[in-house]
Amino acid sequence: MHSEAEESKEVATDVFNSKNLAVQAQKKILGKMVSKSIATTLIDDTSSEVLDELYRVTREYTQNKKEAEKIIKNLIKTVIKLAILYRNNQFNQDELALMEKFKKKVHQLAMTVVSFHQVDYTFDRNVLSRLLNECREMLHQIIRRHLTAKSHGRVNNVFDHFSDCDFLAALYNPFGNFKPHLQKLCDGINKMLDEENI
């Protein structure tokens, strides 16, 4: 049998927990809404087309729908988290300087991807792989203080796939199955370059 004091304590605890749960639910919903609004501003139509094409080529190359979805989801999550950190001024001066280098490296990567497609006999999978791995290393340094080991794992999952020399060779094979995908990817990347979105 409980005393009145114990019962009122339990009731107060129940109320506190209920309110706490409600606040947590609100935060979760608000967090999703904020993430969704940021995602829609970050991932415009052109970016979305490029991501869709990356998904299609990855799915076709891996012959694994689940793995392709995971790689693209990890790419999107990484981009959004990076943007949230950047927009909320979470980076120190060193990280901001590294972020500027990273943006330039991604721009160089995009130009190289398109150039290798447009100019016959220039493709070099080792050059692309090296550029991708340089981007990976910079990204790890930028997010080191801010994101979890799980996020670093996502970065590795994305870059392990896209920097794989066999994948790149298959993608750029002029007689291979991926030629239409590469054309669409390069069209989208070119548009992003023209719009200064990359």
Curated annotation (Swiss-Prot):
Tell me which stretches of the chain form a coiled coil.
Answer: 49-83
Keywords for this protein: Apoptosis, Coiled coil, Cytoplasm
- Source organism, top-level taxon: Eukaryota
GO BP annotation list: apoptotic process; positive regulation of apoptotic process
Entry GO terms, CC? cytoplasm
Subcellular localization is given as:
Cytoplasm
Q: Chief localization class? A: cytoplasm
Q: Which InterPro entries match?
A: TNFAIP8-like (IPR008477), TNFAIP8_sf (IPR038355)
- GO molecular function list: cysteine-type endopeptidase inhibitor activity involved in apoptotic process
Sequence similarity = Belongs to the TNFAIP8 family.
Chain's role: Acts as a negative mediator of apoptosis. Suppresses the TNF-mediated apoptosis by inhibiting caspase-8 activity but not the processing of procaspase-8, subsequently resulting in inhibition of BID cleavage and caspase-3 activation.
Q: What is this protein called?
A: Tumor necrosis factor alpha-induced protein 8
Recorded source organism is Pongo abelii
Taxonomically, what lineage is the organism? Eukaryota, Metazoa, Chordata, Craniata, Vertebrata
